[in-house]
């Protein structure tokens, strides 16, 4: 079973407008509301592919209940931890080919809630084979919270995938307990190392072999339309992908994480894991809906992806 963690979920609200006018009333004809957050995108894709997945994280208030109901409607198993605060809204205003986002900070997690959730996780770990952690940390949690979870998972011998950024990712990298997989894009890699990393293979090899990444089994670097670069133990791979018509790239990274988790839980070969991860990301980009893949197109796309050792 794959356990997904979304510690700062949201209700994602989309407001499509032909034109967005400031300092006046804008009337929206059609509104969509979905259970949001990077980890929930991962969850949906895994569920669509038929994987056994369990969603967890913090939920509170009426908005938290909305997320629970959406997941129930999708027949996705969940075990969230209830908090006193209210789950946040994230608003996207789609206008004139652009997207303006208004993101609420979200609830503040109390110290007792933070510690109690770790106990809750230990129970969930008994059922898990792989853990995928995605997104930002809510207010109130120390930036080392992901590092704490990785430590707990490592003690249980559970592989972990971490898709985060900023200080929470840095705290994990600087800790003694390393995740099994990280998935930075090239900009995030450059930011972590405070240098410019290019798509040149030698530049990428030098970057992912820096001491800060020591002990991490898999480093998978997204290169956008150029595919991906990966390091597994001491072996390097370049992933070449076919050209596709990109409809909506948002959520493609989350779908890639879903592919990695699926590859790990089925103990697939390096080549097949990388093919699956990239196929999931591309399938998401080919759809309008974020965190969604057309499973019927998977096999054909999988065949077109090339993984070479470099």
Swiss-Prot record:
GO terms for biological process: D-tagatose 6-phosphate catabolic process; lactose catabolic process via tagatose-6-phosphate. CDD domains: FruK_PfkB_like. Pathway: Carbohydrate metabolism; D-tagatose 6-phosphate degradation; D-glyceraldehyde 3-phosphate and glycerone phosphate from D-tagatose 6-phosphate: step 1/2. Its EC number is 2.7.1.144. SUPFAM superfamilies: Ribokinase-like (SSF53613). It catalyses: D-tagatofuranose 6-phosphate + ATP = D-tagatofuranose 1,6-bisphosphate + ADP + H(+). Coiled coil: none annotated. It comes from the Bacteria. Belongs to the carbohydrate kinase PfkB family. LacC subfamily. This is Tagatose-6-phosphate kinase. It comes from Staphylococcus haemolyticus (strain JCSC1435). The gene is lacC.
């Amino acid at each position: 079973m794959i356990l997904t963690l979304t510690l700062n979920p949201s209700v994602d609200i989309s407001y499509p407008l032909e034109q967005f006018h400031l300092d006046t009333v804008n009337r929206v004809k059609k509104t969509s509301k979905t259970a949001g957050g990077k980890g929930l995108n991962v969850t949906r894709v895994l569920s669509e592919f038929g994987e056994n997945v369990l969603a967890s994280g913090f939920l509170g208030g009426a908005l938290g209940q909305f997320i629970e109901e959406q997941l129930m409607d999708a027949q996705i198993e969940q075990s969230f931890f209830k908090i006193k605060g209210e789950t946040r809204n994230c608003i996207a205003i789609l206008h004139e080919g652009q997207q303006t986002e208004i993101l609420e900070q979200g609830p503040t997690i109390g110290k007792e809630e933070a510690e109690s959730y770790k106990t809750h996780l230990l129970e969930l770990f008994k059922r898990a084979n792989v853990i995928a952690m995605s997104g930002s940390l809510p207010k109130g949690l120390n930036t080392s919270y992901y590092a704490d979870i990785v430590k707990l998972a490592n003690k249980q011998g559970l592989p972990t995938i971490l898709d985060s950024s900023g200080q929470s990712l840095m705290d994990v990298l600087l800790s003694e307990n390393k995740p099994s997989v990280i998935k930075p894009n090239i900009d995030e890699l450059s930011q972590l190392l405070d240098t410019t990393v290019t798509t040149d293979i030698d530049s990428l090899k030098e970057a992912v072999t820096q001491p800060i990444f020591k002990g991490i089994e898999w480093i998978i670097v997204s290169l956008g339309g150029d595919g991906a670069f990966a390091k597994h133990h001491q072996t390097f791979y370049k992933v070449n992908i076919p050209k596709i018509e990109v409809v909506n790239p948002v959520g493609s990274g989350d779908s890639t994480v879903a592919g990695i988790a699926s590859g790990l839980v089925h103990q697939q070969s390096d080549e097949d894991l990388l093919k699956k991860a990239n196929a999931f990301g591309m399938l998401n980009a080919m759809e309008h809906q974020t965190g969604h893949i057309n499973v019927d197109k998977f096999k054909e796309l999988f065949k077109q992806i090339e993984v070479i050792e470099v």
